[in-house]
Amino acid sequence: MKMLTLDKFEEASEKVKEVTLETKLVYSDYLSDQTGNKVYLKPENMQFTGAYKVRGAYYKISTLSEEERQRGLITASAGNHAQGVAYAAKCYGCKAVIVMPTTTPLIKVNRTKSYGAEVVLYGDVYDEACAHALELAEKNGYTFIHPFDDLAVATGQGTIAMEIFKELPLVEYILVPIGGGGLATGVSTLAKLLNPKIKVIGVEPAGANCMQASFAAGKVTTLPTVNTIADGTAVKTPGSKIFPYIQKNLDDIITVTDDELIVSFLDMVENHKMIVENSGLPTVAALKHLNVKDKRVVSILSGGNMDVITMSSVVQQGLIFRDRIFTVSVLLPDKPGELAKVSETLAKEQGNVIKLEHNQFVSTNRNAAVELRITLECFGTDHKKQIIKALEKAGYKPKIVRTMI
């Protein structure tokens, strides 16, 4: 059965409506002002399962025979495909076994179980989990649903592009995140069928750039290691079946750092009131790397499944990167009242103290200075400089040190 054709994309678009929301584009005034383009967000984080993956999973399962479904389904996933398959299998009344890396966030594990799937935790990264899933499929006769290297799955994911064109026919650029490449395959292939002149840009984390490495080599390439906070895109080897489609239809690949993802998370929370997981943020971080102006750009936000502990850590790191939280070290005479004097100086500058570390061990005698490390909240870089200047004027010889929260 030939996939990734216009007929199949249209068929898939109708099929996935049974289980998905048609997520409406969100125009971003903030990102448009920041980049000089007309930026729209495709919020797949608003799907029932919290990510786009249910599109490919549901369409793939719809193409299976009844006998293939009843044997039971198995897949490997860092989280979102797991939930997609679990939910789709539940809709079809099939058994689902999901192999997930041991590093998978707890929220994704629990949500997958909530759809009735059996979860097996195995390996540190997706590739190890996938190898184990294939072993279980061989041993138990399960039907394997690949998370990205499957043309039917990619066709289902590509239905996102159909919705984008329906709502914004004159779209000029689409930014799509890349893990293994299934979403990029579907979106870029359909986008080029609908408008050969459109530019489709893939975005990967710099620490998991398997597709960029494969592009450069002209063949599927395996990375020795992956290291990124974007767990859903931490893939060593892209799909071999889909790679020719990506070579043909993807115009470029941009990589973004983990630091850029952290700042993008803060931007989405503060300016759009949206929770977007780290793996869904590359297309936001990549906007500043586009060397174009006044273009209609759509960034696909692929998911929003993020546990609260990770969320808290990312917010704090983002505030540090934006100079909204910082730590300063000052030396004080070791005598009563000095702490009150420093506090008064900070209060006058509206610095909000959130942590104090008073270290007497740096002094050599009772008359020498002791170190005080102060972690503060402020309004940004200018306010931070204002506080430092006030401390200098008061004679405290402040020194910026690493913030540990």
Residue ranges and their predicted role:
Residues M1-I405:
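PLP-dependent amino-acid enzyme catalytic core
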